[in-house]
Amino acid sequence: MEVLCQAPAGNSNFACNPKFTAIRTRAISSNDTFKVISSTGNNKKMKGAIRTSIPKPSALPLKVSQLSPSADSMPVPASLQDVEAGKLIENNPSGGDTEELFQYLVEILASRVYDVAIDSPLQNAAKLSKKLGVNFWIKREDMQSVFSFKLRGAYNMMTKLSKEQLERGVITASAGNHAQGVALGAQRLKCTATIVMPVTTPEIKIEAVKNLDGKVVLHGDTFDKAQEHALKLAEDEGLTFIPPFDHPDVIIGQGTIGTEINRQLKDIHAVFVPVGGGGLIAGVAAYFKRVAPHTKIIGVEPFGASSMTQSLYHGERVKLEQVDNFADGVAVALVGEETFRLCKDLIDGMVLVSNDAISAAVKDVYDEGRNILETSGALAIAGAEAYCKYYNIKGENVVAIASGANMDFSKLKLVVDLADIGGQREALLATFMPEEPGSFKKFCELVGPMNITEFKYRYNSGRKQALVLYSVGVNTKSDLESMLERMKSSQLNTVNLTNNNLVKEHLRHLMGGRSEPSNEIFCQFIFPEKPGALRKFLDAFSPRWNISLFHYREQGELDASVLVGFQVPKGEIEEFRVQANNLGYSYEIESLNEASQLIME
């Protein structure tokens, strides 16, 4: 709960916020142009030294601005919220340059990744296969020694360095799986590895790097500042910077996963790949489209972190102004230059999924073999499930890459809360019933055979009706529909809130007797997880606006969702908006949210 820690008094540092040899990619230079997608609709071309991905904390769905797509962009609605989960957003690839793909293939086959990586198993998921009616296969990259595929790309690039470069050492900036991959590679090659991490990095991840003999440098309270410092150290000390995805040698290392899948299974309908910066899918596609072009290569992203989908749609790299960090391993604001070029030429399309679906996929893998994936590690499985359901795929071989298992233990509770809803095994409902004797018994009789998994009620004096917030286990859709019909026939107004994120994240934890403060508005803010975040928030608003509610919910390692109630007179709403915008935290006014009106008013 770093977000609730106060900074020392007087601390004002609250900052938030085609020959093969010719395709070597560097950090983005001041001449690179890309598009910025802003939630405010202020979309613009940018030039600047932005290197890899620097997400702005947000747990809210991405709001996509209305931009005119290029002639060769994908036929997708301007708002990705209109795209159904599982629907393939087609890419119409050109196929790429044959000679270049051959050179990628040769390099992939010659890679030395097996000095550190295992040939990970491709396991049949019997329960998922039966449920979906397909042959569902999971590529178990979570079984690598560092519990992630990232060691492949990092090590492959490091094996290409000269003796002099290795003697000087390597450096990177990461608080995740890439850090361990670089540290392990350096240990194997007997060179020093410096890993720059934000000061807010959990101790368990710091120790994981130290256990691999990596030198940890803690700098800055954001990834942006950590990477800036790493690049400066690389220049000052002559170290080689190992990027997480945007380099051909990194892409080649990740591409070795493709060779293994193709050797382990034939006649594959589609391979589903989690997408962050694009290194993994670019490598897998570079291999498959040369040796088995009939196999579909489909990327999977969360709705709130759709940088590759947006980039393919607009025909150029797009930098997202807001990124949902729920699946923090793929929370990338700007995809790589080389990875985007390859994906544009090679992959068949993208699928988007919700955080609920990702959580359900974590549970599905646990049910299969008692293994727990991290959220980004289960992303491709969620996408493959959604795709098979949407298109009613039957009898085909479907492969999903389980990319990692470095789950932050504190995040498990949130995943558990969302898993049954995401798997359509639970429905979240609100029912109004008379505040009179016998109502509770009648309610239970109407629920009937449905299993109540959560129930919250509080007596409200002075009101004729009480609101009950509850969850029920769902075996079939018809069972739920029958129960809702029974409620309706008995004149008990019932609302299905299963898909309401505000309820799932906050309001289900806030049931109680109602109060009626005047001029109350509700806002959901995304706080960066760092000391001083709360103080900065409190300093941003006029003290004349009373805070009437405050509920904090951790979302991951980088940010937290906070629901706040303010008492703001109607004539001062515009002033409130100005101060909220100046704060620099992502936010949304939730007063018009259906659930907010039902539960809080």
Curated annotation (Swiss-Prot):
Essential cofactor(s): pyridoxal 5'-phosphate
EC number assigned by the record: 4.3.1.19
Transmembrane segments: none
CDD domains per the UniProt record, alphabetical: ACT_ThrD-I_2 (cd04907), Thr-dehyd (cd01562)
Domain ACT-like per the UniProt entry, residue ranges: 427-499, 521-592
Cellular localization per UniProt: Plastid, Chloroplast
Swiss-Prot/TrEMBL catalytic activity: L-threonine = 2-oxobutanoate + NH4(+)
Any one Gene Ontology molecular-function term assigned to this protein's record: L-serine ammonia-lyase activity
Pathway involvement of the protein, from the record: Amino-acid biosynthesis; L-isoleucine biosynthesis; 2-oxobutanoate from L-threonine: step 1/1
One Gene Ontology term, aspect cellular component: chloroplast
Task of the protein: Catalyzes the conversion of threonine to alpha-keto butyrate in isoleucine (Ile) biosynthesis. Required for JA-Ile biosynthesis, a signaling molecule involved in defense and resistance to the herbivore Manduca sexta caterpillars.
Organelle targeting peptide span: 1-51
PANTHER family to which the protein is assigned, alphabetical: THREONINE DEHYDRATASE 2 BIOSYNTHETIC, CHLOROPLASTIC, THREONINE DEHYDRATASE, MITOCHONDRIAL-RELATED
Protein name (Swiss-Prot/TrEMBL): Threonine dehydratase
One Pfam family matching this protein: Thr_dehydrat_C
Enzyme class: lyase
Entry-linked InterPro entries: ACT-like_dom_sf, Ser/Thr_Dehydratase, Ser/Thr_deHydtase_PyrdxlP-BS, TD_ACT-like, TD_ACT-like_sf, Thr_deHydtase_biosynth, TrpB-like_PALP, TrpB-like_PALP_sf
Note: Plants silencing TD exhibit a stunt growth phenotype.
